[in-house]
């Protein structure tokens, strides 16, 4: 069984890195990464930069991406532009893309990684809470993709990788909001792959499973997630890590996947095949509510 690559829990760069791919795989490309200031998005930015790519990392929190950009540039020697941007606001997206194009003159890759999630029964989920997740995950993915298509990809081609989930593959308790949003993004991936393929634009999804060192796992799995029977009973019997997910995204974004479009690559150690759907846990959330 292949051993996972080394990773670190927090939003810090790897102390050492061994290239599994050619070090100049993305030499002088530019990647625009939403949600790039933390978690999976941060590690994607780092791995891309370790393969020669410059990055733009965008998040609502400017202090977060400023700190992240300093770490990333210091560890990799590549350029990283931090931008404050709310994916739900098309004017903010347009301004951010314009700034990125002014800085680099091009954008070759878009990684849609901004997302929101929490546990809540459907009957206790406020209308606004459901809408908020749909706005960030689904509308946000379309907004950034649409703006980049108009401003650069339509005339120059490009690659889009949408970070989704396996929640929509079957019914999952406490996740109607995130499952619906991510399933919609997977459908969007297929539609855009069909429409934009003739402009030399590839569009794919990457669906991670439970990943250590992420805010998502802390919210959904708790501090003992790695010891959960759900994890130990999954095919690979462990959590994934952020570097593994970044490697999968690197493949999809690179020339290695030049004939891959409209696909959903699941990188979850087979977890969705064996994880229970959470119905037995519903009584524990009987008095729970979410009113964002």
Curated annotation (Swiss-Prot):
Q: Which residues carry this modification: Phosphoserine?
A: 287
The entry's cellular-component GO terms read:
cytosol; peroxisomal membrane; peroxisome
Provide the residue positions that the database annotates as binding substrate. Answer: 60, 88, 118, 126-128, 219
Q: Which InterPro entries match?
A: DECR2-like, NAD(P)-bd_dom_sf, SDR_fam
The protein's UniProt keywords, in alphabetical order, are: Acetylation, Fatty acid metabolism, Lipid metabolism, NADP, Oxidoreductase, Peroxisome, Phosphoprotein
A single Gene Ontology molecular function, please?
A: trans-2-enoyl-CoA reductase (NADPH) activity
Q: What class of enzyme is it?
A: oxidoreductase
Compartment(s): Peroxisome
Reply yes or no: does the keyword Oxidoreductase apply.
yes
Q: Report motif location: Microbody targeting signal.
A: 290-292
**Sites where the protein binds NADP(+):** 35-40, 60-64, 86, 182, 208-214
What is this enzyme's EC?
Answer: 1.3.1.124
- Reactions listed under catalytic activity: a (2E,4Z)-dienoyl-CoA + NADPH + H(+) = a 4,5-saturated-(3E)-enoyl-CoA + NADP(+); a (2E,4E)-dienoyl-CoA + NADPH + H(+) = a 4,5-saturated-(3E)-enoyl-CoA + NADP(+); (2E,4Z,7Z,10Z,13Z,16Z,19Z)-docosaheptaenoyl-CoA + NADPH + H(+) = (3E,7Z,10Z,13Z,16Z,19Z)-docosahexaenoyl-CoA + NADP(+)
One GO term under biological process is: unsaturated fatty acid biosynthetic process
Q: List-wise, which residues carry N6-acetyllysine? A: 151, 291
Keyword flag Cytoplasm: no
According to the UniProt entry, which residues carry N-acetylalanine? 2
Q: Name the consequence of residue 137 to A.
A: Reduces enzyme activity by 97%
Question: What is said about its interaction partners and assembly?
Answer: Monomer, dimer and oligomer.
Function in brief: Auxiliary enzyme of beta-oxidation. Participates in the degradation of unsaturated fatty enoyl-CoA esters having double bonds in both even- and odd-numbered positions in peroxisome. Catalyzes the NADP-dependent reduction of 2,4-dienoyl-CoA to yield trans-3-enoyl-CoA. Has activity towards short and medium chain 2,4-dienoyl-CoAs, but also towards 2,4,7,10,13,16,19-docosaheptaenoyl-CoA, suggesting that it does not constitute a rate limiting step in the peroxisomal degradation of docosahexaenoic acid.
Annotated family: Belongs to the short-chain dehydrogenases/reductases (SDR) family. 2,4-dienoyl-CoA reductase subfamily.
**Entries under PANTHER family matching the protein:** PEROXISOMAL 2,4-DIENOYL-COA REDUCTASE (PTHR43296), PEROXISOMAL 2,4-DIENOYL-COA REDUCTASE [(3E)-ENOYL-COA-PRODUCING] (PTHR43296:SF2)
Name assigned to this protein: Peroxisomal 2,4-dienoyl-CoA reductase [(3E)-enoyl-CoA-producing]
Per the UniProt record, the source organism is Homo sapiens
């Amino acid at each position: 069984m292949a051993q996972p690559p080394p990773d670190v829990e927090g939003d810090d760069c790897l102390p050492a890195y061994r290239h599994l791919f050619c070090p100049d795989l993305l030499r002088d490309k530019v990647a625009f990464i939403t949600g790039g200031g933390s978690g999976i998005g941060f590690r994607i930015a780092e791995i891309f930069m370790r393969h020669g790519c410059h990055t733009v990392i965008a998040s609502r929190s400017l202090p977060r991406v400023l700190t992240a950009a300093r770490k990333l540039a210091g560890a990799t020697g590549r350029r990283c532009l931090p931008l404050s941007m709310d994916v739900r606001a098309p004017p903010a997206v347009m301004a951010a893309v314009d700034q990125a194009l002014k800085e680099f003159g091009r954008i070759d890759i878009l990684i849609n990684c901004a997302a929101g999630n929490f546990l809540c029964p459907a009957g206790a989920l406020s209308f606004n809470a459901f809408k908020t997740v749909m706005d960030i995950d689904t509308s946000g993915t379309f907004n950034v993709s649409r703006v980049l298509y108009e401003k650069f990809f339509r005339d120059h081609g490009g690659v889009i990788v949408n970070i989704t989930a396996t929640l929509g593959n079957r019914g999952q308790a406490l996740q109607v909001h995130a499952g619906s949003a991510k399933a919609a993004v997977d459908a969007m991936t297929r539609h855009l792959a069909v429409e934009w393929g003739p402009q030399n634009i590839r569009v794919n999804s990457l669906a991670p499973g439970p990943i250590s060192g992420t805010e998502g796992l802390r919210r959904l799995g708790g501090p003992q997630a790695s010891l959960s029977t759900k994890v130990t009973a999954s095919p690979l019997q462990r959590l994934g890590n952020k570097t593994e997910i970044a490697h999968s995204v690197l493949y999809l974004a690179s020339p290695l996947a030049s004939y891959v479009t409209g696909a959903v690559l699941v990188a979850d150690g087979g977890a969705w095949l064996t994880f229970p759907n959470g119905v037995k846990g519903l009584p524990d959330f009987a008095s729970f509510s979410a009113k964002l």
